[in-house]
């Protein structure tokens, strides 16, 4: 009918745009950087590499915060954040309770307010406890608000340890 066609045309833009970021921070607009490798070989624990990189990021970006279970005091379960709470303060690197859905919800709220949060979920198999918030809230926010809001949240986790039934699972198969 004419009425349906008119309605479809009127709402085409609203329902078919802003599915992906169109901002300057879009992955499609970030220039690619070529990898550079040193000829010098040096064995370093991965946790040290991670810690040093997070340290540099926290120093460079005052709006960056890292939080999750055991992130603050002990520097995460594998010490990839070791000493960073002492160095950067307990408002930038801090612990949360053991509720993955709450951690993701906090991250969304912080991102909506202009901060750049890194929400740590201890193990990959625990993401399932936050899947509804990830799929219904975080993943669709920009689309649902017609590009009016975005929540640039980084979720950090680990998995595939293959050490028994706990902390080794993966929703990826």
Name each model feature, range by range.
Residues 1-173:
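Thiamine diphosphate
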């Amino acid at each position: 009918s004419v009425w349906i066609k008119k309605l479809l045309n009127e709402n085409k833009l609203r329902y078919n745009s802003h599915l992906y970021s169109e901002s300057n921070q879009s992955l499609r607009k970030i220039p690619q950087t070529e990898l550079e490798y040193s000829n010098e070989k040096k064995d370093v624990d991965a946790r040290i590499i991670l810690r040093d990189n997070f340290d540099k990021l926290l120093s460079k970006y005052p709006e960056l915060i890292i939080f999750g279970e055991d992130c603050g005091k002990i520097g995460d379960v594998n010490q990839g954040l070791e000493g960073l709470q002492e160095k950067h303060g307990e408002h930038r690197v801090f612990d949360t309770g053991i509720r993955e859905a709450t951690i993701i919800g906090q991250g969304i709220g912080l991102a909506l307010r202009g901060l750049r949060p890194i929400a740590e979920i201890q193990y990959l198999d625990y993401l399932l406890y936050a899947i509804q918030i990830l799929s219904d809230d975080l993943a669709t926010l920009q689309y649902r608000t017609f590009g009016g809001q975005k929540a640039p949240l980084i979720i950090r986790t680990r998995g595939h340890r293959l050490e028994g039934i706990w902390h080794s699972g993966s929703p990826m198969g």
